[in-house]
Amino acid sequence: MSTKIGFADDLGVSSTEISEFYKVHYQRDIALSDLGFHTWQFEKAPINRGVNSCVVAANDSGLLGVMGLNRRKFYLSGNAINGAELTTWIVDQRIKGTGVGTKILNFITSHFDVLFGMGISQDALPIYVQSGFYYLRYIPRYIHVVDTKKVLNISDHTTYASKLVKDSSCEQHHLHAEKIFWSDQRHNPCVEGNHFSRSLEDLIWRYESHPYFKYNTYKISNSGGSFGYVVLREEITDDVKILHVIDILGSESSFENSITFVENYAKNEGFWAVDVYSTLSQLNKYFNYRSWLSAVDSSFINVPHLFHPLEVRNPATTSLIYWSKSPDVKFCDVSELYVSKQDCDLDRPTMDFIGVYNE
């Protein structure tokens, strides 16, 4: 019985079939098995135009494997190229070891110029590396502590952490912050570094049509005319009150103003802490300068990065794989890459969250 590999829509495989495959074959319940989230992720993304972009392996008996894939333009040194974000990869355990997973990956690398994925399992890592992917074990994650006592209570930490972690002391600022909607804007924002597209169409889909999460976007400006944008998501449960920075957009000259706004916003609104993921050195130097904790380097504390349910992992961040059909030094310079919590399905709701949302 022959096995076909291809894009789901080309092989006549529906989102319902794929989400059901995730439900049956993945080791735990994940949002990709929720049809509402699955459809938003893989059909409603602007470049997909209503067509499911996942890559599947199938024969006459049905699905054998799936790689979640979202088509997305990638800008390398200012030039748009054919890119994709990879997410959860799953093969029916009954055919594991037959090469179907590798065939799926080979199909994908033959159709794109660059690929990125996060949260790589140890089982999948050897296949990625053998296929020419680069691997970053830890994506930089920074944490700004507002309420030390509450953060220590939910974290793993050393006995001396309380001497090193202090409550936020935000300075006075003269910034103007305006809540905006991307659907009201006329121009794409400036984005530093090599990055996935942040066109208005992308941002409207990502932040204003999400089936479960609510995002707030602020435009931050000062008297000198510099302005930038921050996208925030509030994580408020019985166990935690954390502010997630999902995106920081604008030229480098706006970065510190945006971070200052976030620190003050978190303190004024009673959040316990703020966290942000970023690979871009132009941005990360400001987190270091402003003494944000590092999930990788601040070994005396491990602040949770999973919240439904609350869970501490070591380290409290995730990994990145990246691949280029024609790699060069510029592509391999991760310090020039801007990947944030916005990208590669990193800000995905858990099924626990979806269950609470639907109550």
Regions found by a protein language model. Give the residues of each.
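A short helix-loop-beta-strand connector motif used in the catalytic cores of GNAT acetyltransferases and
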Residues: F42-V56, L136-Y138, Y207-Y218, S291-L293
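Short, high-confidence coil segments that cap the C-terminus of an alpha-helix
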Residues: N52, F112-V114, F213-Y215, N268-F271
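Conserved beta-strand in the GNAT
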Residues: C54-V56, G62-R72, E85, G225-E235, ...
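Conserved acetyl-CoA binding element of GNAT-fold acetyltransferases
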Residues: A80-Q93, V240-S251
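Conserved acetyl-CoA-binding loop-helix of GNAT-fold acetyltransferases
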Residues: T88-S110, S253-Y265
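Non-catalytic interaction/regulatory modules that flank or connect domains
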Residues: W182-D238
